[in-house]
Amino acid sequence: MDKEFRKQGRALREISYIDRLRYVGNNAMGSLSFSPQESEEFIGKSLEIIGIEKLNQNALAIFEEDSHDVLETLNRIASSGGSRPKGNLYFSKDLRLCNESWQPSFDGWIVKFKTHSTVLASEEGVCEYIYAKLAKQAGITLPDTHLFELSDSRLFAIQRFDREDQRRIFVDVL
């Protein structure tokens, strides 16, 4: 977010909490959003509908080379915390196409991209997928999960439980 503000020529010391909330707008995790949202020109245009393979290549470019060309896009989809790069994406029912914005018949998913900076490297996704399957076998209720098998990596994805079409669902997790 700070990089986007700098790119717009705004000094960070002058950015208010309201400016930051307007930037997040309707793209926040969970059930809360903020209105009015920043203009489309400021926050960027919607991703073209692309395949997960291309998105994964872009994520690797960001986290290994800090490529500015794709940083802006991935910054908008990666609003969740944690040590691994993630994307909050919407996928077609067959999971072949994705977009950062809701589309009719697309569902919300969180995808965890691979990194080379951890012990497991490209096997992180496989491990998390196995953990999810074990949790389901143990009777723990989880949203749908998927393992994307790409040419050079396997990515874990979990369907969002706080979205239904364009509706946000409030969930209190203890």
What positions do the PLM features span?
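Phosphate/dinucleotide-binding and metal-coordinating scaffold of catalytic cores
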Residues: 1-174
